[in-house]
Amino acid sequence: EKDEFYKKYKDRVGEIVTGEVYQIWKNEIMILDDEGNELILPKREMIPRDFFKKGDSMRAVVLRVEMYNSNPKIILSRTAPEFLERLFELEVPEILDGLITVKKIVREPGERAKVAVESYDDRIDPVGACVGMKGSRIHGIVRELKNENIDVINYTSNIQLLIQRSLSPAKVSSITLDDKTGKADVFLPADQVSLAIGKGGHNIKLAGKLVGYTIDVYRESNEDEDMDVDLDEFVDEIDAWIIDELKGIGLDTAKSVLEMSDADLSLIHISEPTRLRRI
């Protein structure tokens, strides 16, 4: 019986299962499947805003199957990219039918996800099909993931175009790629820099994971550049690591720093934004 249980779930790794919450501990939850088998959802595999009570129905993906003291242990996950992919398969028939392919998924569970999709049929808009009329298809997925923001991106093998799409909603001016180092320098208008970075830096971090490049954003130069002062001029008054952090998110001049809010500056762990502005 144990061998059958082990084999059943070993063959279901990567698939969605539905079960009932049976017992709740500090670091994990026990789920019972429809046959009364015990499955484990560790806290680290839960979305931060997940909250379950005994008797609740829940869905997760089978992450792995282990043997523990000769007993099968089934580990579930709600944070794995595969969970999001299976949810899309349930909501979007074109994916299950093979008309749309999910090329890659990256997630910051509960915060944001980026899903690159592609269709070999020119008559199908893969992004529109995944989102659905007025968001009808994606809304259910977002609710399941506790309001995780999901960006569906039309995949392309053109890296520059893929970077541009993955940084949406920011409007990119130009991109310089270094294939040897795997770095991409992205230039944007000043008012687009914070959009590219996103709340908590999630947008730029996920875009980098999606395309496989380290993305650095820079404020686009303009006619007022000669009235501005390069941050390097403040090296005697501002710690070098702070200047490097600011440059890393596209803030390379005094004016660009002044245009940022205290909240945005705090994202890079600057504890005294007021003092920084005064300098």
Range-by-range predicted roles:
Residues E1-R275:
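RNA-contacting regions in translation and RNA-metabolism proteins
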